[in-house]
Amino acid sequence: MEETKTINIPVMADIFPKGEKPEFLFWVGCAGAFDDRYKKVARAFTKILHHLNVSYAVLGKEETCTGDPARRAGNEMLYQMQALMNIETFTRYEIKKILTICPHCYNIFKNDYPDLGGKYEVIHYTQFLQKLINENKLKIDSSILKDNHITFHDPCYLGRCNNEYDAPREVLNRVSTKITEMKR
């Protein structure tokens, strides 16, 4: 993962004033920014975006909390303040499409932000990868993990809340033939 540090990750505040408008905002999220294991997911996804020359940027220091934890904890006022600040930032940068690696971020952008005027095409990274694979834009060497056993559990906010069960499984089935569903 060390080689990811050499990738020049575009930041909206740097490129937008130059007239550059990327197709996607990659929302890194709290887990992708702070959790050591999830940082690896963010780095790997960034490498894929870079490798495929996807037009994207991050908010960098302008990325704040989505407000999801506040809303789930019952603090509606704090949620709305955080969401409206993000919507204002997205509007300033003319954001239309958001890529996210976090199921919680995916859920709140897709289902809650529209009530506050934040209407975006929100794409979970497994959906994005599935599309790239199906379009033959992303080639996967399935021989690398073909003998590895993968156990999968649906993230609640991706599966149960958004009924997205297929994308993660299709991606996993491309990399391994030994997939086990966790018991519910």
Where are these regions (language model features)?
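Iron-sulfur-cluster electron-transfer modules
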Residues: 1-101, 106-113, 117, 132-135
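Short, structured patches in soluble enzyme cores that scaffold and shape functional sites
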Residues: 28, 124-126, 154
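Conserved active-site and cofactor/substrate-binding residues in soluble primary-metabolism enzymes
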Residues: 40, 81, 127, 163, ...
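Short, catalytically relevant binding-site loops at active-site mouths
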Residues: 105-107, 128-131, 157-160
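Short, structured coil segments at secondary-structure junctions
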Residues: 115-120, 175
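Short hydrophobic/aromatic-enriched beta-strand-loop microsegments
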Residues: 118-125, 180
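Short, acidic/turn-prone active-site loops that include or flank metal/cofactor-
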Residues: 124-130, 184
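Redox cofactor-anchoring modules in respiratory/redox and cofactor-processing assemblies
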Residues: 134-184
